[in-house]
């Protein structure tokens, strides 16, 4: 992770390579540099799919008869009235469904797909654990449709590939659409491993690359594992998350197994890595893993899930001594749901999570920004709330992540076992092509895709009020200059938005193509309801 570069309005902090010079001198003197990050992955915007719940592109890999007395396909969760409110079985989504809709994803301005883990999971529903509810974890009769219950980290789950579309072919197919693939990895746990009425095949077991079993929890509670066995084996003898097996990260056997499995998939075309439940494993483990991967892939980008709204807690992972791993910006997620959801809190509430200058994060410009995901309730907002959230997400600092279906407001407000992870399907994709949320998302995401200032530039906040916000994104190195004036209005009425312009230039508004000379100093523009304006200047500048 690259160290953040700081800037303050009216002066250069450490981003400037020399004292500020007047624009006319740029031809003969080195111009000041303004770089939020030089991380290549910062160019990306990420579309996140629970692969099984996106689109069924190949019904032949559904295995609808799998599981025997604990079937795995289509297991609805029923309310007290008998209505299906969610599903905890496989629903058919696969690699073919993603490839079939790769153009749909790319059109929205995304350049990467993050899919849930691809590794083999058990072939039955889990018979232990607590009954399904909104608490965590409640896993009784749930299946591994989500991919996080790995039993063989070197084998694809059979529900994902198709003939001629194994993982290497899948990543190559995405490449043709300009889409990277983010590999979701787990280092904390395997599958549910105890509390079953009787032992079930694969649960609590680990298999090697050759298909042979190398570890088995034997349906024992962790405290039944001896200290000697825990020290030399695969599993700790204390629980962590529900009934999931708790990997012994201090064991060289575990480290070697996991590291080599991650490299196995990277060798087949995965482009970046998302780390699940990072806070459940000590930092030294992830330093070993990231060092091991970067020995072969020195530019590999990692980001991790540490579910906490405390910036200092999640920032630890971004430090070089802990692996230099970016994180999903959970403090930002909480703020965005509050501001753009039905609570409709003021835009000024967004400022606190940015941490542009206080040094909490190694580099705040490399954080993954999002407003909801598969583990929490989807954002409960009107269409305008989603539009405004995307306008902010794709112009402010960080790398945007959007959860599948959000482009149509899919299952808004619903939690994990209340519809959050429902099957989307080809019919919904086709129906939503011209949805107003999606059309507005395309507009602003394509602007970011073309703008180095929005991708990598420093952010200088100007005016944030109840319904409006204005700020500057600035990027300049020895060969490229781009200054972006960003203005947002989340009100249902037109609003005048003010901004202090740092540089006189002939600006071009990125969404409309309108051109205007804007002089340095105070300036305001009247914005339509629920809208954004991004004025771009490509001449050299000094702030």
Give, region by region, the residue ranges found by the protein language model:
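Bacterial N-terminal signal peptides
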Residues: 13-23
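Boundary at the C-terminal end of the N-terminal hydrophobic targeting segment
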Residues: 25-27
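C-terminal beta-strand-rich structural cap/linker in extracellular carbohydrate-active enzymes
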Residues: 45, 518-543
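Active-site-proximal helices and loops of the catalytic beta/alpha 8
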Residues: 29-30, 171-173, 178, 189, ...
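Short acidic/polar active-site loop segments enriched in Thr and Asp
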Residues: 111, 271, 400
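Bacterial N-terminal signal peptides that target proteins for export
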Residues: 3-14
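Conserved, mostly hydrophobic/aromatic
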Residues: 49, 105, 115, 153, ...
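Substrate-binding/active-site clefts of carbohydrate-active enzymes
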Residues: 32, 38-44, 52-268, 288-297, ...
């Amino acid at each position: 992770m690259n160290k953040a570069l700081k800037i303050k309005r009216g002066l250069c902090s450490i981003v400037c390579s020399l004292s500020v010079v007047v624009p006319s001198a740029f031809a003969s003197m080195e111009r000041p540099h303004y770089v939020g990050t030089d991380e290549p992955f910062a160019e990306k915007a990420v579309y996140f799919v629970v692969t099984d719940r996106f689109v069924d592109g190949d019904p032949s890999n559904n295995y609808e008869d799998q599981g025997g007395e604990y079937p795995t396909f289509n297991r609805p969760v029923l309310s007290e009235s008998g209505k299906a409110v969610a599903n905890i079985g496989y629903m058919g989504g696969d690699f073919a469904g993603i490839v079939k809709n790769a153009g749909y994803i790319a059109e929205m301005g995304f350049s990467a797909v993050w899919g849930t883990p691809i590794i083999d999971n058990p072939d039955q529903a889990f018979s232990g654990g607590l009954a399904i509810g909104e608490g965590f974890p409640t896993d009784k009769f749930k299946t591994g449709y989500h991919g996080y219950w790995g039993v063989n980290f070197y084998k694809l789950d059979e529900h994902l590939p198709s003939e001629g579309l194994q993982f290497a072919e899948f990543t190559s197919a995405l490449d043709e659409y300009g889409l990277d693939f983010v590999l979701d990895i787990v280092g904390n746990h395997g599958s549910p491993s105890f509390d079953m009425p009787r032992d079930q095949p694969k649960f609590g077991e680990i298999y090697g690359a050759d298909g042979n079993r190398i570890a088995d929890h034997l349906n024992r509670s962790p405290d039944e594992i001896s200290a000697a066995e825990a020290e030399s084996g695969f599993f700790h003898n204390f629980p962590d998350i529900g009934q999931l097996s708790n990997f012994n990260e201090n064991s060289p056997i575990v480290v070697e197994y996991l590291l080599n499995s991650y490299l196995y998939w990277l060798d087949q075309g995965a482009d970046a890595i998302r780390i699940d439940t990072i806070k459940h494993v000590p930092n030294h483990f992830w330093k070993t893993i990231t060092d091991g991967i970067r020995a072969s892939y020195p530019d590999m980008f990692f980001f991790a899930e540490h579910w906490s709204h405390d910036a200092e807690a999640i920032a630890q992972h971004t430090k070089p001594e802990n692996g230099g791993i970016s994180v999903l910006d959970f403090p930002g997620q909480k703020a965005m749901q509050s501001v753009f959801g039905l609570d409709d809190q003021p835009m000024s509430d967004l400022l606190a999570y940015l941490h542009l200058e206080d040094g909490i994060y190694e580099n705040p410009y490399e954080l993954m920004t999002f407003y909801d995901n598969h583990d929490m309730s989807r954002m409960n907002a009107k269409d305008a709330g989603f539009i405004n959230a995307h306008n902010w997400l794709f112009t402010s600092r960080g790398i945007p992540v959007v959860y599948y279906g959000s482009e149509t407001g899919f299952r808004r407000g619903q939690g994990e076992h209340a519809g959050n992870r429902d099957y989307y399907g080809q019919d919904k994709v086709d129906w939503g092509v011209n949805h107003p949320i999606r059309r507005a998302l395309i507009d602003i995401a394509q602007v970011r895709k073309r703008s180095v200032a929005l991708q990598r530039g420093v952010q200088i906040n100007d005016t944030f009020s109840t319904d409006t916000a204005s700020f500057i994104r600035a990027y300049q190195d020895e060969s490229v200059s781009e200054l972006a004036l960003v203005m947002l209005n989340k009100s249902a009425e037109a609003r005048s938005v003010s901004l202090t312009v740092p540089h006189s230039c002939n600006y071009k508004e990125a969404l409309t193509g309108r051109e205007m000379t804007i002089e340095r100093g105070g300036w305001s523009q009247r914005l339509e309801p629920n809208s954004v304006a991004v004025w771009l200047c490509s001449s050299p500048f000094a702030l």
